[in-house]
Amino acid sequence: MGARASILRGEKLDAWEKIKLRPGGKKHYMLKHLVWANRELEKFALNPDLLDTSAGCKQIIKQLQPALQTGTEELKSLFNTVATLYCVHQKIEIKDTKEALDKIEEEQNESQQKTQQAGAADRGKDSQNYPIVQNMQGQMVHQPISARTLNAWVKVVEEKAFSPEVIPMFTALSEGATPQDLNTMLNTVGGHQAAMQMLKDTINEEAAEWDRLHPVHAGPVAPGQMRDPRGSDIAGTTSTLQEQIAWMTGNPPVPVGDIYKRWIILGLNKIVRMYSPVSILDIKQGPKEPFRDYVDRFFKTLRAEQATQDVKNWMTDTLLVQNANPDCKTILRALGPGASLEEMMTACQGVGGPAHKARVLAEAMSQVNNTTIMMQKSNFKGPKRAIKCFNCGKEGHLARNCRAPRKKGCWKCGKEGHQMKDCTERQANFFRETLAFQQGKAREFPSEQTRANSPTRESQTRANSPTTRELQVRGSNTFSEAGAERQGSLNFPQITLWQRPLVTIKIGGQLKEALLDTGADDTVLEEINLPGKWKPKMIGGIGGFIKVRQYDQIIIEICGKKAIGTVLVGPTPVNIIGRNMLTQLGRTLNFPISPIETVPVKLKPGMDGPKVKQWPLTEEKIKALTAICEEMEQEGKISRIGPENPYNTPVFAIKKKDSTKWRKLVDFRELNKRTQDFWEVQLGIPHPAGLKKKKSVTVLDVGDAYFSVPLDEGFRKYTAFTIPSTNNETPGIRYQYNVLPQGWKGSPPIFQSSMPQILEPFRAPNPEIVIYQYMDDLYVGSDLEIGQHRAPIEELREHLLKWGFTTPDKKHQKEPPFLWMGYELHPDKWTVQPIQLPEKDSWTVNDIQKLVGKLNWASQIYPGIKVRQLCKLLRGAKALTDIVTLTEEAELELAENREILKEPVHGVFYDPSKDLIAEIQKQGNDQWTFQFYQEPFKNLKTGKFAKRGTAHTNDVKQLTAVVQKIALESIVIWGKTPKFRLPIQKETWEAWWTDYWQATWIPEWEFVNTPPLVKLWYQLEKEPIAGVETFYVDGAANRETKIGKAGYVTDRGRQKIVSLTETTNQKTELQAIQLALQDSGSEVNIVTDSQYALGIILAQPDKSESEIVNQIIEQLISKERVYLSWVPAHKGIGGNEQVDKLVSSGIRKVLFLDGIDKAQEEHEKYHSNWRAMANEFNIPPVVPKEIVACCDKCQLKGEAIHGQVNCSPGIWQLDCTHLEGKIILVAVHVASGYIEAEVIPAETGQETAYFLLKLAGRWPVRVIHTDNGSNFTSNAVKAACWWAGIQQEFGIPYNPQSQGVVESMNKELKKIIGQVREQAEHLKTAVQMAVFIHNFKRRGGIGGYSAGERIIDIIASDIQTKELQNQILKIQNFRVYYRDSRDPIWKGPAKLLWKGEGAVVIQDNSDIKVVPRRKAKIIRDYGKQMAGADCVAGRQDED
């Protein structure tokens, strides 16, 4: 105790002991109070030494003050003691504790005011557009969301109807909002009830997930602490506004507003997908669809996609070709990657028809004939053959000069221990039992997967074979099934595919080295002279068509085995032995299905699999499909199924590129509609500017990607398809997929998510290797030397192969430049692939579109590219083939772009150790260019911006939009924002920013003097100019005649009115301002009542698409000072009223709205919503909306939306709510929103049962839905339900059919009670008034009825429906015998559907017919027991 007595000494201790504990009390502070405070501080984990100084006391006060409201008496006493001690330290004279607290409060207020004054100068730097702000006392208070924001939100939903633009608009409008604000926004949406219900379901699901992940902590909440928010708290249903503010501003904060907004955005995404159901991935060209129609559909869907322009450009470049039908795709790929849209459309005209095929054949014949003539002149000497290395496979050097690491073993036979020159075999022994380059035993598949994927004995044997991917050769003496059983398993000779299967073949007496390629249909050899006749042919090759000579019945000897078939001779990069020869040798290639864990897939809720009949197919297509499916079955990709699978999807076949082979296609459109939605795991493509510089680079491509990933076993049954037989000779053969099918919407996202799982085991032990993966394209980089780099590349390929993924050699790029994702990569730089701008005398719309696309693609590395003038040529609805005349500006722009593209430009790679800088230049004509760089003159990437955004704008506003685009792009590519260098002076920026700080966000930036600089051309005054003439301006126009007037009246007696034609109200308002500026001096005050005109001019535009606005801008620039103000119209303001009468004369229609006063009276009494007033008093909606907007009691929250949950007519929800310490029992009719409510004396079962019986006596109640409260689970309520025949159900948390309706009605009822509480003395009276207002004075929801009208309508409709059903059931007891036309024989019996005066409607089997009464006999159906010999139709005739 003595130790802490040293806190105060001498004079301070005397002053301490003179202070009274309470005003007017006798007790004074003593030394023991200091000792007590010392001990209490230790309880609260605060340092007692802080009591020694005034600064320490101030810190303690700051720490304790927030907990005072919820703290104990001891905490309050401790705070009072420390506050008094602070005054003693500061030598502030006080008499008692209350004075000390008052002094502390005064000091805090002064400090707060100083802080706010100091921050006033910097107010422009931080956005204040948040609903939660700090008041003068330092407390966080809530500013309700403004009506202007709500109006903007409602307008967006009404105009856009949940198109993709709704989500960013919602995000912007709800910045910083609390859950209560967000609910207000959602409640203002009047229509779109289905969408709102979807949103509500999503919120409920997310809230339940939140509760699962954040369980409630056991035990009570500690003093001074907030409880943790539950899911329903975040959604604003069970939390108060004060709790929401406390969570959002606490330490640490819980951003409940942001969390709730994220849930809403998830729901909005689902709604947007529902309203825009067609994805760009679903746009595919039909087999016979013209290419032009397909392109029209493609670009129409592309506009609705939620993607950046770069991604849309990529979609155009890749998906347009990828989703074309095979005939068009063959031609499009032959055109190359840089083909324009016009070239594509021209090339694809009439594709597939006989005329097209004749043209192709004629061209091929002429080419071959020319070649033949040339060969005769040169005595058949072929081109000199380039030398080729045996070791690495490259041309240009021999194996002894090869620098690549030497292959192990003999290059001919594959055995180790000798080299090729010492090899005795001189021929590749690929058919021996011992494997070349044996790699050891690879992983084996689990037996379950083998059974699922390989139904036949033969395929099971292959799936369990030692190698992951192998070529099997069936010997001439294959085992019988019995023999196989005796020996245990078949043991065919195998060739591993760890290296390329190159063999030596003998053809036409010549030895050649060739590649065994099971992926090739045909056998293709490089230039070789073969005997016999040949015919010309074109086949699809790498990069386009290859012209070849076709020789038939050619004998090829492969390792002692002979095969006879067709051989094609032409300029192939490698000799290929295709399937036409390999099948004769009995070879098959086994692709195992990857052992990746399958992704579970389901159908959409409430949907079943597709049951689409197979359409007829020609005999040749059936044969082709049968062969393809047998091969796929052997490889385990599909399995046979029986009749127990009820699902089916149509299958068909189309010719491949060379038009000799067939390709199987499955029409998965119906399955795609029924399959669950997937989230695209990868939302964009990687950009080379974001790549870090690497010493060594390799680019790989994954082959047979989809067919290597297994499909969820539970979902496989839905992929069933049938191969029919000709003339239904035999039952169709049924299959289902075991792997991801081509054309199914789940294949891309599942493959995207599977690849990272496969690459992760390789990435972890190889951190020095960087892998960029987009779908099946792989970029692999490292800082290793090229020799060291290639070793892990081979490891990666082997790793992928073990998982069932191949990396074909033909797409394995080892040397620069690397072609990747449309770019060209070099070791230290990158660029876009070469771009050639076409030279044309006449340009079509299609030409300009392709030209702009090329320039946009080039602009990411070529600085200064402009397309604005070219884009202007495309305005308006024009056909693709329309001729466009280039304007002088467009020709100049095109010429400038040609000059820019003449010199190749490269970008460098990103260095994380250096700063990222973005510099912007203004190009004029609303066009901007920018560069990202880390070192001067070494650009990472460039770009352009040419979006105006609004009709009236200025350069500063555009500059902010450019900065935001750049910041977003930078975050996507590099994960951070750059330092900006902007062509605008700080003074200019500050002048605009002072008034428009809320318009946008600007990061850190510095001024760069790059002309032309951005500047403001004029500024408006903030206050009226004294001694200057004031112009009151106004305009009016008639909607029907389009005749209007504009003019002004001045405070000095001047006036001017001009008549206008073909105008609108908005134009006349602007015309009036222009007249005032024109007729005034260098300084002027202008007063308008047009918010539209005021908004345009206050934004200080310096350019506009409107001629009138441009004239106003010119006048403003010429003035020295201008003050512009707004006053509300029709409020009796002097000058405004005078000019209004002048311009309205003969223009505006005068409306005598007698109901306005009555509507205002009604609203003051009942606070009716605007729909009810508009309906009852027959006044335009704008008037009641204004009445509601002006009522302070109706601005608490948006209107409640009724009838969102569609339930049966007999369901009611009951709940108890509390107000003013009393209990209100509320019952809500779910289907209509009708309310019954009463104040009950106690929350007991007896009172609840009595209320329930009263309710059942007034309305038909079949089911009641309650929570699990003790009064609802009581025996009294159960007895009342039993007696009245009511079924009782209890609520389930977060179930939309649970207590959601009554919970929302509780809030609505309390809101109405708050509006009318002053009119009633007792709460029970106010409750009944509120029930009356809700049921009969509020309209909205289903049908636009009030709740009272709606419940009556629903019950009446229910009675009518039941009555109608009874009549239908009665009428179905009759049967009809009838005669048809002149046929004398009676037919029947048929079902009676309807009986009229002159005719009856009957159903005979599946046909519905109308029969005249005179030709029909109606009898009652008495069943089989009455069907005796005497039961004749005529005797039972009811007519």
From Swiss-Prot:
One of its GO terms (molecular function) is RNA-directed DNA polymerase activity. Residues 635-825 form the Reverse transcriptase domain. Residues 8-43 are annotated as: Interaction with host CALM1. The active site is at 517 (for protease activity). Residues 1374-1421 bind DNA. Residues 12-19 are annotated as: Interaction with host AP3D1. Residues 73-77 are annotated as: Interaction with membrane phosphatidylinositol 4,5-bisphosphate. GO terms for biological process: DNA integration; DNA recombination; establishment of integrated proviral latency; proteolysis; symbiont entry into host cell; symbiont-mediated activation of host apoptosis; symbiont-mediated suppression of host gene expression; viral genome integration into host DNA. It comes from the Viruses. A motif (Tryptophan repeat motif) lies at residues 989-1005. Residues 7-31 are annotated as: Interaction with Gp41. Its cofactor is Mg(2+). HIV-1 lineages are divided in three main groups, M (for Major), O (for Outlier), and N (for New, or Non-M, Non-O). The vast majority of strains found worldwide belong to the group M. Group O seems to be endemic to and largely confined to Cameroon and neighboring countries in West Central Africa, where these viruses represent a small minority of HIV-1 strains. The group N is represented by a limited number of isolates from Cameroonian persons. The group M is further subdivided in 9 clades or subtypes (A to D, F to H, J and K). Resistance to inhibitors associated with mutations are observed both in viral protease and in reverse transcriptase. Most of the time, single mutations confer only a modest reduction in drug susceptibility. Combination of several mutations is usually required to develop a high-level drug resistance. These mutations are predominantly found in clade B viruses and not in other genotypes. They are listed in the clade B representative isolate HXB2 (AC P04585). This is Gag-Pol polyprotein. It comes from Human immunodeficiency virus type 1 group M subtype C (isolate ETH2220) (HIV-1).
